[in-house]
Amino acid sequence: MLVAMVATTSAQAEIKFDKVVHNFGNFSEKSPVQKTTFTFTNVGNKPLVINQAIASCGCTVPSYTKQPIAPGQKGTITVTYNGKGMFPGHFKKSITVRSNGNVEMTRLYIEGVMTEETKQ
């Protein structure tokens, strides 16, 4: 009996971020809203779909590319942090990104130090 083994490569989307952490550095509580953009590339061979991006806190709001990203193309996730009403000091927040990629979940992080407004 002869058994033939055939290797098949299935098409998959694959997300690759340029960075997964962004540090805002120091900023004043007088300017509590900070924004950054995470750029990603579909390095797979099937269209990539971001199913959701969920922040760990209501002070952090992600918005993301809704249409499928073709292989080799780029997409973005813009994250807005609003420190208004928050205590000054260091913060670190996460954004959980779920996609149809070969790695279903990726976690992004933002951090920084909101400095106290000096009273005169």
Model-derived segments and their meaning:
Residues Q34-T36, G75, F91, T106:
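Hydrophobic core residues within well-ordered beta-strands of beta-rich domains
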Residues N45-T76:
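Surface-exposed binding patches on compact interaction domains or structured appendages
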